[in-house]
Amino acid sequence: MPRLKLTIAYVGTQYHGWQTQARKNASPLPTIQNIIEDAVAHVLGERVHVHGAGRTDAGVHAEAQVAHLDVPESRARMDWQLALNTLLPRDIRIADAVLVPDTFHAQHSAVRKTYEYRLWLSKRYTPPELFPFVWACGSVDVERMGSRSLLGKRDFASLKNAGTDLRTTVRTILSITRTPEGPLPEGCLELTWRFEADGFLKQMVRNTMGLLVAVGRGKLEPADIPGILDACDRRIAPLT
């Protein structure tokens, strides 16, 4: 069957993450995967599994989440972007829909993944339009928040969500960048941290930002980070 690659953007505030979550004797929780599969079923008249590149947690947003599904030959060349966007809620959008070889897999073909985390450096006031998209962490010393010791292939067990059951907690962080770079301009209240890796553990980036913010607040020293990682114990790292 022809394979379709979807690039999906969404505001995750109202959703319980990406993956469908069945409940006994109740309707599934609203998730991105479930909502998209509902729309596909409306088009095809049958339920088709939509494979995502990875799971996202409740409330997480996406600019380019990749997924794939197999569709009948008779429907392969229809305008899937228009068809799905007509059916989907406004906070879930198909940015692109293209046919790909059947060897493509949204998860297994991924070379790297990118995650952004936005900080708002004031607890006094957060603009309402930014509230769902930033962590209002308050004032931090950005110059202390060095992230070099997080780069490379490491065991990130100390920064995974409790209860995560995986074959390995080793991941490779390829780059970490901050916008704006260098000393903050006067009056700057928003920072964006961008992480690129071969993959992420559940809530790994959230917990990493909790660690960096603790350093920025002076609760930890930058030199503490390697020891926290080496401990491979979530209880050692700051709670978020």
Model region roles, listed by residue range:
Residues 1-240:
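Structured-RNA-binding interfaces characteristic of tRNA pseudouridine synthases
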